[in-house]
């Protein structure tokens, strides 16, 4: 399974770059909210996780310069057809993150933040390590995966069709159409 390694599925297909936003947040119990960076570490303090983990290396002109945004590079950081985010490093939350902590003086930070269990255990086992399971990929995605769905039966009552995306109920006429 590719999940929890360096490829993550966004559960959308035919992703479009327009309006695409992606961040990696860390749930920081010390401050009580999700943070796009770590609050400590010589090389990690206040540096966006998206940069530390290799997903922000280019600016909007594809020049090698950080800009705080996800590098939407088809085939390198994203597979738009399958809806996969691709970290350009093998163990983003393991050895890659660990490489930023000073060997002698920051072993406590390495022990606190590095989620090596992702690469040593099954996904189910790793998710149960609550002290480390605090990283989240969040953002906005537009998908061109529209398709037709044939509803069974005849004479479907108008406004009787309910469509949801996750737990969000979509609005007929705005988010989808029904040909009664």
Residue ranges of predicted features:
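Surface-exposed, low-hydrophobicity segments enriched in Gly/Pro/acidic/Ser residues
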Residues: 1-180
